[in-house]
C-alpha cells in the first residue's frame, strides 16, 4: 500500500487521514485473525481434553498455519516490496552490484543442481524399491495361489495385487516426475547458466575497455601537462626581439629559440588534441559501461524470476503427483481391513472337511498276536527278489482293503512318492553329484556299461564325465555338449573332463578346468572348442614347435626330400576349392585369422582343419611362411647365379617369359642350376611352381596370370642375402633385382613342362579328412598311408628287382650273381614279417595290402566307416620332426650303392651318387625317386642294416665298372 500511495498524486489532508484509519483497521483485523482462541466460547478447549490423535493433528495443523502465515503475511513494520525499477536502480548504484547479481544467479544454478541431484537419486531408490517389491509380490502370489482352502487367502492375494499396483504406480510416478519435474528444471538451469556466463563475459569486456580508456586518458593528461609546462618555460625564457643592429651571430641564436618555441607549441597543441580525444573516449566508454550494467542487471533479474516461476510450478506438480501416489495406499489398506473384519477363524478348515467324500467306515483293525518261531531249512540263500513263500501277516493277506494302513503309507513314502520330501531335499540318486564316489552305492545303483566308441563321445565311466557333457544334441549330430557350439575340428575329438591343470592348445593360456581328448590328449577350454582348428590324429599330439621364422632345413620332415607340410596343406586346400577365386594370392587375409592359423599350425602341425577358413587367409599363411624363412627356398649361395640367368632372360628379347618356345640353352642352364639345389629345396620349389602353374591355367577366372604370380612370389622365393655378404648391395640394385626375380618365377611357371616335365606334375593332394576314422592316415602330413610307406621302406632294402623298368639293370645283375646272397633272402623274409606285424599293430592307422584295404582306399574322400575302433592310449609316440638319422643313413646307402639306381625311372634329372653337374638328355622329364619315409630302429633292424651295408660294398666291388656307354644312355 505504501508503494501504491507513493505513486498517486498528493491528496487533501482529510483524505489522507481516512486512509490512515483504514490502514489501522486492516492491521487490527490481521492481528485478530492470528489469535488462536474463540472470543464467543466460554472456556478455551484444553489440549488434554482432546483425544491423542486429534490433539496431534491439531498441533500439526497449528504449526503449519503459523509457518504458512509467517511466509505469507508480512508485518506492517517490515520493508515494503520493491518494484523492478527500484531493484535494478539499487543494484546499479551499489558498488559491485553487477557482480553480486551474477553471483546470485550462479548460486541459484548451484541450488537447482543440488535439487535435481537429490530428486534423481531419490527417484532411483524408489524405482529399485518398487521393482523389488513387485518381484517379491509376484513370487509370493504364485506361492500362495498354489495352496487351496487357506485362511485369508483372498485377502493376501488382494494385498499382493495391491503391492503390484502400487509398484506400477511408483514406476509411472517416477517416469512422470522425470518428465514434468526434472527436465523443465534442468532446461531452465542450463539456460540461466548459459546466459550468466555470457553476461559475465560481456561485463568483463566492458570493464577492460573502460580501464584501457581511463589509462589512456591519464597518459594523455600527463603528456598534455608536460608539453604545456615545456611551452611556458620556453616562452618565458626567451628575451624580446633585439634591434636590427644586432650582430649576425645573435640573429642565429634568436632564430633557433624561435624554432624551439614553435616546436613546443605544436607539441602542446598535439597533446591537447590527444587529451581531448581520450576524454571523449573515456566518457563514451563510461556510458557504454552504464548501459551494459543496466542491461545485465535487468536480464539477470528476469532470468531469476523465470527460474523461480519454473521452480514453483514444477514443485507444485511434484507435490500433487506425490500426494496422489500417497493417497492411494491408505484407501487400499482401509478397504483390505474392512474385508478382513468379517472373517471367522476355522471357516476354511470347515470347507476343506466338507469337500472330502465320506465313504464306508473302515473295518476295525485286527489285534496283533504272537507267532512262535518255526525253523525253516534252506538249501540255498534266500533270494530277496523272489516272492515271499512263507505265511503272510494278516494285514498283507487282505487284498480288498479300501485304503492302506498308516504303516503301509509310511513304507510307501520311504520308497519315494512323487512330490515327497525325499525328492525336495535331494535324497534321490540323480540329485547327488556325479563326481562323488558315493553317488552309486550298493547293487541297486545305476551302472553305465562301457560301449565301443564311435569317435564322438567318451566311453569312460560316468563319474569321469563333465557335467556339461550330456545327452543333448542341440549343437549338431553327435555333439556331446548342450551349451557350447563345437567347430568342425572339435567334433573329431573324443572329449572328457580335464583331470588336472594344463595349457590350452588354442589360446595358449593355463587352465584348471577344461576338456581333454582321450586319444590325442589335446587340452582346450570349453569356450575355445567353438574356434578349434586342430583335428584329432588318434595318437598323442606332439609338442608345440616353431614353424615360422626358422631355417628351411630345420623344418620337421620325415625324409630329406619331403615338402614341408605347411606348403602341402595350403596348396592342397587352395587347389581343392579356390583355384578360380578372383584375386587369389593378391588379396590379403585378415591379420587376426592369419595369426590364429599360424598358431594352429605350430600347435597341431599337419592336423589343421582348413575347410572353414577363407582362401585369402590360407594364401596369406603360405606367403608369410615363405617370407619368414631365414634361409629361403632358393639358398643364398645360389642367388647370384639365378639372378644372372634372369638378366640373360631380360637381355635376350627371344627369351621373354611369355615366349612359347624358349632357347634350349636357357632351359639347360636353368636345369643345371636346379640340380644344385638341396633335395628338399628342389622338391618344394617344384611343388610350388606346379601349384602356381595350375593357378595360372585358370587366368580367365582368377585374373592371376603368370606375370602377376611372379610379381607376388619372386621376392619371396628369391631373396638376396641379408648378412655381411649383402653390405655392399645398394638399394638400386635390390630394386632392379626385384624385377629379375619376378621374371624368373614367371619363366618357371610358363615353361614348367620344358623344365620339370609335364608327366610328373605333382597331383593335388586331397585336403585333410575330417572323419575320425580316416584321420590317422593323414597324420604328420604324409601323402600316403603308413602301411604303404612301410611297404616302400622295404623296396630299397630288397633291391626291388621286379620293379625295375630297364632291362639293362637285369643284365647287370645277371653279370654279378653275388648280388642276391642267402643273407639277402633272409633279410627280405624278416622285413616282410616286420611289415605284417606293424600292419597288424597299426590296423587303425593306415591301409594294408589286402584287397579290402585297397578297395577302401579307392573310395571317395567323404566315405567313412562306422565300425568302432579301440585305440590304445599308450601307443608309439610320433616321429620327432628332425632330419631322421636313419633316413640319412638310407640315403647315404643309396648313394653308395649303384644297384639302387635300378629303382629310378628312366629320364630322371637327379641320380643318387652323381654330382650336381650331371646332365640329362634334352627333352627328358625331371623326376625324383622318393626315399623311405619312416623307419623304426631296433636291434634287429640295426644288425640287418649293417649286414646290408657290407653286402652293398661287396656288390660295389663286383660291379665296379659296368658299361659306361649304357650308363650314360640311361642318364
Swiss-Prot record:
Q: Name one GO biological process term.
A: regulation of small GTPase mediated signal transduction
Key words, A-Z: Coiled coil, GTPase activation, Metal-binding, Phosphoprotein, Zinc, Zinc-finger
For the modification Phosphoserine, the affected residues are: 19, 75, 235, 238, 247, 436, 440, 884, 908, 924
GO MF annotation: an example: GTPase activator activity
Record's signal peptide:
none
Q: Which cysteines are joined by disulfide bonds?
A: none
Q: What's one GO-annotated cellular component?
A: plasma membrane
The record's listing under SUPFAM superfamilies reads: BAR/IMD domain-like (SSF103657), Cysteine-rich domain (SSF57889), GTPase activation domain, GAP (SSF48350)
Subunit structure and binding partners:
Interacts with GEM through its N-terminal.
Please identify the protein, giving its name as recorded: GEM-interacting protein
Query: What organism is recorded for this protein?
Result: Mus musculus (Mouse)
